Every structure is written in C-alpha cells, then in structure tokens.
C-alpha cells in the first residue's frame, strides 16, 4: 500500500484529510497503472497456482508423511498463498475502489507484511537446510519438533516485524485543492508525519532492506557457492541434472533480488536525504511503487521453481487431479503392488541373466581345457576391478547426499 508523508508536526486522532496539492506526474501515473496490471496478472495466475501446489503438497504430506524439507515447502506455499489472498484488497484500495475501515486496513497490513517476511525467511531456511544436508558426512534429520519451533519463531518474528504496519496504517481521505472531500478517495495507507520520517520510517525501511533483500541473497549465495563446489565431485549424470535445477533456481532469485536490494537501498537514502517538497515526494512514491512489485513476483515464481520444476512433483500433482491422494490406504496399497511387481520383474531378469552368464562361463572353460593353455595374467575384474569398486564405494557418499539434496529441494 502507499506510504504518505504529511507535512505536519502532530498526529490527530481523527481520520486524516490530505490535500491533493502535489499533482500526480505522468511517469508516476504510468507506473501505478503498470503495477495494477502486473498485480492483477499475479493474482489471477499466481493465486490458483499456489492453491494447487499447496493442496498437492498437503495431500502428499498426508499420504507419504512429513519431512523437514516438506514442512519448509508447505510453509513457503502457505505464506505465498496468504500474501496473494490479501493482495486484491490492497490493489483495489490503491486504486481508490475499495473503501475500508481503519481496523480492516490494519489487519490486512499486518497479514501482508508478516506473510512476506516469513516467505523470505523460509527461502533462507530452505537454503540453510540443504547446506546442512550436504555439509554433514552422515545425514541425520533434525527432529520435526525443532523444525516446527523454528517456523513458530519465524512467524513470531514476522508478526513483530509487521508491528509498525499495524501502528501506522490508517485510512486517509484525499481532499481536493479547495479543501473539499473527494468522494471515493478514502484509501488504506501507511501514514507518517514529518517528525516520524527520520526515525520510524527510515528505521523500518532499513529493516525491510535487510530482511527482505540482503539476508535472503546472502543465504542463497552462501549455500549455492558450497553447493557448486560439492557438485564438482559428483558423477556427470548427477551433476548435469542437479546443476540445471539449481542454476534456474538461483538465477531467477538473484535476477529479482539484485534490482530489489538496489531500489530498497536507494529508497532508504531518499527517505533520509531528500527534502519534503512535491517533486521529491512524488519521486518517493515512484520508487515505492517499483519496490512493491518484487515480493509479489516471488509469490508467482516460487511454486514454479520449488514445485513444478522439482523432482517427482508433477507426478504427485497428476495423482492429486485423479483423486489418488485422497485415500491414503488405497494409495499406499497401489504403491506396494507396483513395488512388488517391479521387484518380481527385476528378480526374473536377474535369474535369466545369471543362467546366461553360467552357460557362457562353462563354454569358455571348455575351450580353455581344449587348448591346454596356461595364463599367468590376473583374471579380468579381480585386482583392478576391486580397486575401482573400492574407490566407487568411498566416492558414493557425495552423490548420495547430492541426490538427497536435489530430491528434497522439491519438497516431495
């Protein structure tokens, strides 16, 4: 929602009335229209997409059980869906199309800022959890209790972080230049008076820059730098499959976050250094409009990156559409039948292969006895083959942990 800085020195208890003395420039009007169009697209595409992914993840958790990655993924999809649920009300309010009370504005503001904060924090937690999997030689899952405690603390921190929004969000009635009230121009805004700009507003913008911008970038970069060095020691097939997935994930995140962090840093500087005339107030609103889009774009691409591009999630989604995940017992029974059939086919194939191998060995032995020849060479695959097998045994730990990390990144 918009941030309004009013050139007064005290806060009135009544509903603030703001005179429209600063005309909306053409660039600001174009940016606000573009913001409304992009947000509408995100709502109609990202909302159903997050709902489908969240329902699929919840049903998969119910059927196959929970794990630390799936708990984090479920929390990420929930926060994104919650953000996109309140976004239509904020968009309509910004366009002066939805009158609201002060209580409803404060409620929507708290939900919006807390869900966005928890969403960014969950992305960092997922990166930290994947680092923990690759860094430890033996992968021991942390207890679900500690995972839930971490998420509860994250939500608590998100609610505390959104307290300035609860305090300073209000309804502002926009008046014309003649002081007369304009019908339908009552909007939900973050309202700050002049004395609060260099204390409350500046401090909050700096915190937004750190929590929403810098911290997730640092966590993601730190994890994937270690991830890249680990992938170099994996097999070529595993390396290619995992690097493709991780490269798309990291490039998409950094491509959004790098401009966002730059805009937020510049916005904090503008709040502290620029005067409060009409020109600079309009520029502040323009910068704020640009920075508001990035969290919404994350809500759109997160289900694509973490779910639809993840391992085995599309199969789970098809099973969800067919209703196979609704009955847990029937699903597990069908999985057991498929596993038993596969094991039977594998055993039959191994038996036929062993028979063919024994026949081939017998024929070779007969030929050797017939030739009466003696060889002092090592049999094929004894010393050299054993050395290669031992080397492979010691090097399978990294691909195994890498496979776990790639599988758990998708949360399924």
Swiss-Prot record:
Residues 388-397 have a biased composition (Polar residues). It comes from the Viruses. Pfam families: 7tm_1 (PF00001). The chain crosses the membrane at residues 36-56, 81-101, 107-127, 148-168, 207-227, 245-265, 293-313. Residues 377-412 are annotated as: Disordered. Its main location: virion. PANTHER family: CELL ADHESION MOLECULE, G-PROTEIN COUPLED RECEPTORS FAMILY 1 PROFILE DOMAIN-CONTAINING PROTEIN. G-protein-coupled receptor (vGPCR) that constitutively activates multiple oncogenic signaling pathways including STAT3, AP-1, phospholipase C, NF-kappa-B or cAMP-responsive element (CRE) pathways. Plays an important role in viral reactivation from latency through activation of host CREB1, facilitating its recruitment to the viral major immediate early (MIE) genes. In turn, expression of the MIE-driven genes such as UL123 are de-repressed. Also facilitates virus dissemination via the extracellular and cell-to-cell route. It comes from Human cytomegalovirus (strain Merlin). One of its GO terms (cellular component) is virion component. Glycans are attached at residues 7, 19, 23. This is G-protein coupled receptor homolog UL33. One of its GO terms (molecular function) is G protein-coupled receptor activity. It is a multi-pass membrane protein. Residues 57-80, 128-147, 228-244, 314-412 are intravirion. Disruption phenotype: UL33-deficient virus displays a growth defect due to deficiency in extracellular transmission. In addition, UL33 disruption attenuates viral reactivation. Belongs to the G-protein coupled receptor 1 family. Heterodimerizes with US28. The gene is UL33.
């Amino acid at each position: 929602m918009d941030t309004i800085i009013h050139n007064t020195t005290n806060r009135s208890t009544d509903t603030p009335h703001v005179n429209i003395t600063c005309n909306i420039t053409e660039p600001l009007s174009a940016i606000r229209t573009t913001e409304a169009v992009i947000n509408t697209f995100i709502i109609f595409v990202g909302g159903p997409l997050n709902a489908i992914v969240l329902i699929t993840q919840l049903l998969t958790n119910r059927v196959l059980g929970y794990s630390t990655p799936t708990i984090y993924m479920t929390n990420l999809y929930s926060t994104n869906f919650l953000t996109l649920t309140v976004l239509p009300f904020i968009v309509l309010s910004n366009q002066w199309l939805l009158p609201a009370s002060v209580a409803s504005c404060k409620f929507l503001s708290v939900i919006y800022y807390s869900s966005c904060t928890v969403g960014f924090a969950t992305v960092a937690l997922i990166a930290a959890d994947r680092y923990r999997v690759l860094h430890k030689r033996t992968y021991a899952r942390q207890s679900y209790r500690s995972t839930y405690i971490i998420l509860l603390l994250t939500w608590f921190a998100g609610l505390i972080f959104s307290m300035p929004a609860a305090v300073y969000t209000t309804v502002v009635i926009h008046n014309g230049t003649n002081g007369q009230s304009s019908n339908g121009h009552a909007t939900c805004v973050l309202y700050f008076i002049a004395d609060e700009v260099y204390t409350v507003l500046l401090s909050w913008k700096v915190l937004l820059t750190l929590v929403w911008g810098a911290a997730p970038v640092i966590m993601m970069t730190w994890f994937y730098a270690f991830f890249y060095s680990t992938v170099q020691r994996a097999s070529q097939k595993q390396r290619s499959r995992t690097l493709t997935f991780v490269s798309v994930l990291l490039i998409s995140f950094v491509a959004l976050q790098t401009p966002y962090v730059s805009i937020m840093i510049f916005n904090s500087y503008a709040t502290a250094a620029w005067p409060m005339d009409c020109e600079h107030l309009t520029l502040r609103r323009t910068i704020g409009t640009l920075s508001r889009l990035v969290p919404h774009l994350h809500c759109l691409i997160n289900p694509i990156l973490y779910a639809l591009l993840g391992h085995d999630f599309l199969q789970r989604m098809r099973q969800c559409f067919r209703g196979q995940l609704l009955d847990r017992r029937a699903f597990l029974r069908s999985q057991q039948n498929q596993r038993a059939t596969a094991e039977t086919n594998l055993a039959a194939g191994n038996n036929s292969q062993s028979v063919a191998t024994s026949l081939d060995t017998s024929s070779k032995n007969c030929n050797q006895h017939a030739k009466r020849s003696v060889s002092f060479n090592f049999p094929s695959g004894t010393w050299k083959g054993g050395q290669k097998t031992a080397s492979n045994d010691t090097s399978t730990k990294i691909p195994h942990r890498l496979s776990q990390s790639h599988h758990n990144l998708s949360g399924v």
